[in-house]
């Protein structure tokens, strides 16, 4: 039950990245993402990892939907499938991709950071629960 939103997210994201779905309509991509993350937040509001994951996704979807269906990114000059240049007319620029990543040459948004932290916490909680169950079964 807890993995359902993550699996749906991976499916939609994979369909976009690998098969090119939503390239002609990024607005629908971010609308689906918004609805998916909102659903995740409602179902799992007590789980801090999934809640942070959902809030990050909602932040990314909102800034993209408000700015015409594409995520504004600092430093680019052309419009790509889901990205557009950040300008003076960009709404909520603090939620756009502008944070320099320590890995490679990627730019991150505040929502991306929440997504990563949320997934990390969710996995740590899951592994801790697995370890606890295993420890109880073999009586360490």
Q: Residue ranges of each PLM-predicted region?
A:
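Aromatic-anchored segments of alpha-helical transmembrane domains
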Residues: 9-18, 56-66
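Membrane-interface loop-to-helix entry segments
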Residues: 23-32, 105-117
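Extracytosolic (periplasmic/ER-lumenal) interhelical loops and adjacent juxtamembrane/interface segments
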Residues: 72-109
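Interfacial segments of alpha-helical transmembrane regions
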Residues: 36-65
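Transmembrane alpha-helical insertion/packing segments
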Residues: 1-31
